[in-house]
Amino acid sequence: MTDKTVQQQDESQLVAARRAKMGRWIEDYGVYPWGHREDGLISLESARSLFDQSAHDAFKEDDSNDARPRVKVAGRCIQHRAMGKLTFLVIRDDTGDLQISCSKAAMPIEQFKVASKLDYGDIIVAEGAMGMTNKGEICVWADSFTLSCKSLAPPPEKFHGLNDSELRYRQRYVDMYTSQDTIKTFKARSLIVSTIRTFMHGEGYLEVETPMMQPIAGGAAAKPFETHHNALGI
């Protein structure tokens, strides 16, 4: 049995385990893990910029005076730590990363149980006040937590990333999942192409698409032939 076969079997077992977990969540907590519309979301970069140090300090001195800005964010889980009555996770979108802090006392118990058992790759929506952890990390102290979409396929290893260059080129979405540099590259490329296209249109040029590959399969039209191998005499 090859290493690739073993890896495929391991991935199949992980997918089966995630499917089973999703089924339990649907039955026990009533989650809807197939994606749904969420209004009022802002990017993680925008949420981080709303952090107010003075409001955070005032809240620490008197928790009845909560003037911290509230945000609603969504992203893909890339880190997860469950620590009893607290769960910390890091989510990512196309603007960066942000920590979400979940307290058992601050949200419905069903939501906290889902948050404490997330898998890497799950897409979540969190709503709460912008604050800071005891270690000085800016975060969202969530009081509302929703699983927006369950990830069934396990992501590439956290530390090694995606080393298979062929897989990177064939499955760009996986490459973008593992590498922020890839996202930056595609953003830069998109901006360059868009700028060139806008300039050319402004100069009166017309964009015309030209087929680069033959649209009609021609393999069946090949004719069989005989050849001779001089060295082997066959």
What is each model feature region?
Residues T2-D28, P33-I234:
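Class II aminoacyl-tRNA synthetase-like tRNA-binding/catalytic domains
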